[in-house]
Amino acid sequence: MSATRRREKEDKPVLAICYDFDKTLSPDDMQAQGYIQSVYDGDVASFWTESNGMAEKFEMDTNLAYMYKMVDEARGRILLTKDSLEEYGSRVKLFPGVEDWFERIRQYGKQKGVIIEHYIISSGLKEMIQGTSVAKNGAFEKVYASSFMYDDKGVPIWPAQVVNYTNKTQFLFRIEKGVLDVNDSGVNDYFPPEEYRVPFRNIVYIGDSDTDIPCMKLVNLNGGHSIGVYNNDTLDKSKVFKMFNDNRIKYFAPADYTKGSELDTLVKAIINRTASNEILESIHYECKGEWIDNRNDSKKSISKRNKINLIIALDGSGSFATTHNIIGDMLDIEEWTKDECEMLIDIALQNSQVKYILHDKDVCIFYKCILESYGQHNEKTKKIQELLSNGQ
């Protein structure tokens, strides 16, 4: 297991915008934009019918099914390699404005004092996404998607990563904590909320359908922003209406990423809100820090007063029962100062009630701890040691 490589929290707020890919950034499934045409003569429906049928028959993950189907159908027809998948990716059509969206939004965030990071969380193929023009231009901080393992000739031989609608959510937690490596178990480590690199309130999730619902719900429940998009050519809003009705999304807009579009205006408004909100969050955590310091100081003061009261009570104890009760309370205190230890040593030598029962189990344990905390050897500590050893 790899060691945790956690990205440190920035000195400016980070807004992570996470995208599904198919029908969110692109009008169609990526496999239907080159690959299926090569092996199925363009019969897209048949490919998905057979793939989904195989998943149902073998109780198989649908993403594993399509990955198997892609490799199986390519055999003897086309040479399927990592390079050819990236080449298919280069043919994928993108919605209007996507080409310059990522850098334009980054620059807008920069003007507002907010660091913008773009992430892909998709059930599509990582290799095809990496072949798109936007990915090659460095649009994405990280691409989380299904992918193959390849042999030394670049031929896919086994699934390396499978991303389905439920395990998509893990990547949101990775982004939140800055632990981006998919094999880094540090994502499970505890961090105080103020140390999260990208708290959920600063996560935007943009998707189009049911497969995005777990991520949308998680973002919504934790104060983030979920956006449903629909194709502006068909104007079919049935999916986003359903998601809105079920409280899965806060907003919906056409998948139009051009400057001045509804989506552009909405995301910029979220950036503006993030800039203002993070000022308030910063003030909140400053107040929290001061409150914690004050609370700790108060606890220390109360603890010190309690210890002094117990020392005074022990010094004046006139019965064995009272002495045992006081010692019982003192055993609950973890730390004693040097001055307090010295007072307790004097009491053991001067108060006959205490001195007489030094060999009793609870009193003996307590005074051994006091001698250890005191850490000095002199006539007084030597005498205490003798009394502890000899039982008077």
Show where each model-derived region lies.
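Long, low-complexity, intrinsically disordered N-terminal extensions of eukaryotic proteins, enriched
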Residues: 1-9, 14, 46-49, 312-315, ...
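C-terminal cap/substrate-recognition subdomain and adjoining C-terminal extension
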Residues: 96-119, 123-339, 347, 355-356, ...
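C-terminal accessory/interaction regions of large nucleic acid-associated machines
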Residues: 353, 363-367
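Long, compositionally biased charged/polar accessory segments in the mid-to-C-terminal portions
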Residues: 53, 346-347
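Alpha-helical substrate-recognition element adjacent to the catalytic core
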Residues: 2-152, 243
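Low-complexity, intrinsically disordered regions enriched in charged/polar residues
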Residues: 30, 41, 54, 58-61, ...
